[in-house]
């Protein structure tokens, strides 16, 4: 599943890719936002478990350990997602397609602890995540290949640095 934002021109930006059973929307619930400015797109048939925000954020009158653990988990989840948001911001704040692409690929290599890795996007998805034009992204990948900086095939990359 992907969290996607559409601008007024219909341009798509992938905010995040989600794994099965990964929660989403908790920041909007905690902030009291009624209508989230994102859409969730499922690539395959999915079932969504809807939890009411009020029940999540306000523990029962017994102040049981379950609710304390639940609140702790929500805070931890928000903190982790904040870190991921800042990692994406670090990428999208770059000025050029090349800078954005290399910043993203370096992050992936570091995360995988390897210069060889598979990303969760096809070319259009990667362009949407980086907030760049797909044809410009493909041209930049081609240049980086010719310069010997990387090898790639579909969503597989190998960095040579």
Task: Give the location of each predicted region.
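Glycine- and acidic-residue-biased ligand/ion/polar-headgroup-sensing regions
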Residues: 1-6, 20-22
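A generic structural motif
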Residues: 4-8, 41-43
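Residues that act as N-cap/strand-start positions at coil-to-secondary-structure junctions
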Residues: 9, 34-35, 144
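Cyclic-nucleotide recognition modules
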Residues: 14-72
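Inter-domain helical "communication" segments and dimerization helices
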Residues: 59-72, 76, 80-93
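Short alpha-helical segments that sit at the start of domains
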Residues: 84-108
